[in-house]
Amino acid sequence: MGCMKSKRRDPTQNSDSSEKVDGKPGKHGEKAVLVFSEIGSMEDSVRINPVLLDYAQRLSEEIVARAVQQWAEVDSRYSDIPYIECDVP
């Protein structure tokens, strides 16, 4: 199951029909639609290539490692700058 957003305006659509999850009105012209996966997903998972899964796992680990390294470098570069709170609301 997933969620897709559509920013197209439908002239026949009510302007009150776009609501957020918390019940507050959302932006006009946006609509969330649930998308259900197919019933036979267990059969599809058997056909996944293990080499492809291994590659995807290594790639995702590399991306996370690079992101953590980049965060650590930026954090160490700017850690000596004090945080100044603003008194103006």
Swiss-Prot record:
One of its GO terms (molecular function) is protein kinase A regulatory subunit binding. Its main location: membrane. The keyword Cell membrane applies. May be palmitoylated at Cys-3. Residues 1-29 are annotated as: Disordered. One of its GO terms (cellular component) is plasma membrane. The keyword Transmembrane does not apply. Residues 17-29 have a biased composition (Basic and acidic residues). A lipid is attached at G2 (N-myristoyl glycine). It holds the Pfam family SmAKAP. It is found in: Cell membrane. Keywords: Cell membrane, Lipoprotein, Membrane, Myristate, Palmitate. Belongs to the small membrane AKAP family. PANTHER family: SMALL MEMBRANE A-KINASE ANCHOR PROTEIN. Binds to type I regulatory subunits of protein kinase A and may anchor/target them to the plasma membrane. This is Small membrane A-kinase anchor protein. It comes from Danio rerio.
